[in-house]
Amino acid sequence: MGCPCELRIYAGQKHQAQLAAKACMDEATRFEQKYSRYLDSSAATEINRSAGIKPVEIDAETYAILKYAGVCYEQSNGLFDISSGVLRHVWHAQRSDLPSEDEILRHLNLVGWEKIELSDQNIFLPISGMELDFGGIVKEYAADAIAALARTMSIRHGLVNLGGDISIIGPQVNNRPWPIGIVHPTIADTAISVIHLANGALATSGGYERYVEIAGKRYSHLINPQTGWPVESLLS
């Protein structure tokens, strides 16, 4: 998934823990193979490759993820938009100068969840060059799915951490909640806060590890889909 992943599980027997761990890791691999934009065979690549050409048939799982992406888009007033991944072509690590407003505008014309044609059978990106980036939503979905899978295998204590997207399987063995540290965005090896969770989930992101540096200034990988510029007011 292009990020460190962690699985912590506790079981009464070693064999039970090994079986559950393998099942959980296999499920994580399945999600990556299905939704990674870096794999030619993935559903995400097929959707993007067909932009402006034809609708792509989708299964129930993909439809559920896309419907949830739509909910996030509405609840965030358009700030969470999985069609904004195309802006990574503007803000990439090889840049040595700031992009022009024309370059940003050309890419912004390819952004917009409201442009997408979606049904429970297929999806169509109507403009050639449009792209969906599932990375901002699939990790959360996958973490919840993996935690649920572990519980079906009688795992009652543990957590799933997919690059900062955390889903709790159950509390620690002593029934205490898990302490989840929120990394300080500017001070190395420091937590800005600690949240204790015995159930539920938590998703975090920040620009302290993934960023573009231009003329000595760091620009976050978190990009405002309405302006085309990296966010500055929210570091973590």
What are the roles of these predicted feature ranges?
Residues 1-236:
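Mature catalytic core of soluble alpha/beta enzymes
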